Amino acid sequence: MELTPREKDKLLIFTAALLAERRQARGLKLNYPEAVALISAAIMEGARDGKTVADLMYYGTTILSRGDVMDGVAEMIPDIQVEATFPDGTKLVTVHQPIV
């Protein structure tokens, strides 16, 4: 199977998000890469589902709270930018203060 670099990046984010979901389900607090992957994957999936950029900018702030992540992780992530594929093309989604 041949994948473009962009497709490989999406697959890596999805895999990291899946691992983060499993760890979260076991009651573990997420670290920096797990938190970023989980939020990024949710945004990419929301774009595929047809949600708008504005909807996803808000949705990205509801996925995780400070209680879901290790100490200091929320401060390490001032914003997350994701290039997501929407029905009408690729757009950049920026989520400010994703973990509150």
From Swiss-Prot:
Q: Which Pfam families match?
A: Urease_gamma (PF00547)
Q: In which pathway does it act?
A: Nitrogen metabolism; urea degradation; CO(2) and NH(3) from urea (urease route): step 1/1
**Metal-binding found in the keyword field:** no
The enzyme's E.C. designation? 3.5.1.5
Q: What reaction does this enzyme carry out catalytically?
A: urea + 2 H2O + H(+) = hydrogencarbonate + 2 NH4(+)
For this UniProt entry, what's an example GO CC term? cytoplasm
**Compartments (UniProt record):** Cytoplasm
Entry-linked PANTHER family: UREASE (PTHR33569:SF1)
Protein's name in the database = Urease subunit gamma
Q: Which organism is it from?
A: Ralstonia nicotianae (strain ATCC BAA-1114 / GMI1000) (Ralstonia solanacearum)
This protein's gene is called: ureA
